Structure formats: structure tokens, C-alpha cells
């Protein structure tokens, strides 16, 4: 038998080192049937500069083993039968601003008894500044002697492009959103 190691890596300028990410592991092996598939696996969770944590992960009603990891942690399932293929799915965290950079599957066999799958998420936060310059004598003042205009901004962060050669665009770590629109109306300055 061998092992299956799942590791979690976080990149970007706005990650939360205490955030837990959920993984669903489905193990398949020609030798498995409902009677022989294991109900639980021993797991070792490793993290730099901390003592290893030993725990157990049980198979749920869907036949999956559910684990949670923080950035920088690795969970290793022990005593995984040769010939086992692991399909690992990470829950979706895009609503929280985390982009899945990599996903993997892994197989434990006699050639790779210690299989590994690494999962990386990236989260970056930037600053959007809007400047309204009123020129001339026809500026309309509406609130307490202040000019009023509105704006809405739509930033699409799913598809980043490298614009290090382009000036005057908002960037995070030298990159800017591929799709960006700004519409200015009714904002008080």
C-alpha cells in the first residue's frame, strides 16, 4: 500500500491563513466493492513549524472522504491500496475572491506508492480610485455647494492579463482585470 498527500497553497496579497478549504476525495479501485471499501483512513496533517496532527477521515453517505486544509498544510492519507485512483474536488471559493489556479487527480500504484496532488488558490485585492475633474463655469452644484456625479464599476477578476507595459490602468501585482468598465454618474465630490 501507499499514501495520498493533498496539499494546499495560497498565493496573492489578500489570503487568509486561517481559512479552511474543503476537499472531497473519491477513491476508486477495482478491488473495492461496498463490502471492502474502507470506512475511514488515518490521516497525518503537516504544517511548517508545527507538530504533525494525526486524525481520521470517514467515508460519508456519498462515498467521499471530506477533508479541510488551510494554506500551507498537507494531509496524507495512509495505507491506500495500490491501484487506487483518487479524484479530488475542492469546494468553490470564487464568491470569496479565491481563484482556483490548479486542480489535480492522483493514482497510487506500485510505480508511485506515494501519490500527491497540490491545490493552489490565488486571492488579490486592489484599490479602485475614481477622479472627477470639473472644468469650466458650467459645473452643476447640487448638494451643499458640491458637485454631484455617480459611477459604477464592474471588474472581472476571473481572467487576468499581464499589462505591465500599459500605463494608467488599475493593477494588482502588475496585473489588471481583463474586463473593466467604469461609468460615472451622480457621485458627490
Task: List the predicted regions and their residue ranges.
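Solvent-exposed loop/turn and edge beta-strand elements of beta-rich ligand-binding domains
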Residues: 1-189
